[in-house]
């Protein structure tokens, strides 16, 4: 049975969890099978910046980092569920969240 794979990325964990809960609510409302949310490892991007060059050639570095939280949700395909997901304002226009949808045909949920 084909299914829809939703990958969600965000730097804000609370916003990510809110979107995941909204997706779970829509799926529960329509009654289709769902697997997930599966938390993926957090990606940490580090940027070292030379703050000052100290006395006698010593260097002082600052390190800035950004954490990217990721989740995967698999949903059995249903026209009604997909329409509800696409029309939900929380899903369609997030500011800090990126969402990827992928239709997979040959795998069982």
From Swiss-Prot:
Lineage: Archaea, Nanobdellota, Candidatus Nanoarchaeia, Nanoarchaeales, Nanoarchaeaceae
Function: Involved in the binding of tRNA to the ribosomes.
Organism: Nanoarchaeum equitans (strain Kin4-M)
GO cellular component: small ribosomal subunit
Keywords: Ribonucleoprotein, Ribosomal protein
Protein encoded by which gene: rps10
Alphabetical list of PANTHER family matching this protein: 30S RIBOSOMAL PROTEIN S10 FAMILY MEMBER
SMART domains: Ribosomal_S10
Molecular function GO labels: structural constituent of ribosome; tRNA binding
Coiled-coil stretches: none
Taxonomy, superkingdom: Archaea
Family: Belongs to the universal ribosomal protein uS10 family.
UniProt key word Metal-binding: no
Name the record gives this protein: Small ribosomal subunit protein uS10
BP term (GO), one: translation
Self-association and partners: Part of the 30S ribosomal subunit.
PROSITE patterns (UniProt xref): RIBOSOMAL_S10
